[in-house]
Each structure stands twice: as C-alpha cells, then as structure tokens.
C-alpha cells in the first residue's frame, strides 16, 4: 500500500518538478537571432565564436527552433569556410549541425572531404555521420 501511494505521488509530482523551457515570444526570438547573426558577422574572433556557441546552446535547450535561427545559416556557412582558427570553424560546424538545414549538412560533408585541416575535417565528418544516424537517412558518401 505504501509503495502504491509513493508511486502515485511520484507520477503526480514529477511533471510539476521537472524543468520546463519557457517559450519565448516571436519578437524576442527574432531579436535574439538578429543579434547573434550580427555577432557571427563581426570582425572580433571571440564574438564570432561565442555567438555561434550561444546559437547552438539556445537551439539545444529548445529556447529557439532551428526554423527561427535559419537567418544565421549563411553567415555560419561563411564562418565555416573562411574562419581564421580551428575553434571558430568548429563552432560554426556545430551550430550548422544543430540547425539541421540540408544546405548546412551538405556543406559539412564538403568540408569533411575536401578541407586540408585534419581537425576540422574530422569533426565535420563526425557531425555529418551523426546527423544521418540520428535522422535515419543515408550517407551520400563513405569517407
């Protein structure tokens, strides 16, 4: 009897105790994406890398949907292609992976195959494989 009462209490109280992400209004989401896009386009290395990481975190924590953040895809593609450091390019690759846009995923494949930087290439290859494993889709190429 005690166990039944405990189980019922747990089933009733867990949904109230578990953390829930609050849904941001559309205006705030748009402002957040616009500010992060400006940061990604910045000439400051730390701001570019930090903006890409924050974008990934916000999508990962469900504060932003990948559709909301699609405006930042082109600057992220540019950052992945022309980044000055490995960390900057990796931050862009991870953010593109989290966006899940087919153009970004295809670009990860291109960097994985053709990039001379072994570290960036290996991470892009792993992100490319992970995306297809998580979504149950086919790879376009074996590395």
Q: How would you name each of these model-derived features?
A:
Residues 26-38, 62-80, 101-113, 134-143:
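Amphipathic alpha-helical scaffolding segments comprising HEAT/armadillo-like alpha-solenoid repeats
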Residues 51, 92, 123-124:
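Conserved hydrophobic register position within alpha-solenoid helical repeats
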Residues 48-59:
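HEAT-repeat alpha-solenoid elements in large eukaryotic scaffold proteins
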Residues 4-13:
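Sec-dependent N-terminal signal peptides
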Residues 56-57, 97, 129:
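Structural signature of alpha-helical solenoid repeat scaffolds
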Residues 43-44, 84-85, 116-117:
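Short inter-helical turns and helix N-cap capping residues of alpha-solenoid HEAT/ARM repeat scaffolds
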């Amino acid at each position: 009897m005690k166990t039944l009462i405990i189980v019922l209490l747990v089933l009733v109280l867990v949904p109230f105790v578990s953390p829930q992400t609050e849904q941001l209004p559309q205006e705030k989401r748009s402002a957040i994406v616009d500010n992060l896009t400006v940061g990604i386009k910045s000439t400051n290395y730390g701001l570019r890398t930090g903006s890409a990481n924050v974008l990934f975190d916000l999508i990962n924590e469900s504060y932003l949907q990948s559709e909301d953040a699609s405006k930042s895809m082109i600057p992220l593609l540019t950052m992945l292609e022309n980044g000055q450091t490995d960390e900057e390019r990796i931050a862009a690759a991870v953010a593109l992976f989290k966006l899940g846009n087919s153009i970004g995923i295809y670009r990860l494949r291109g960097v994985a195959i053709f990039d001379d930087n072994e570290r960036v290439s290996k991470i892009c290859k792993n992100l490319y494989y992970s995306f297809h494993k998580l979504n149950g889709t086919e790879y376009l190429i074996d590395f």
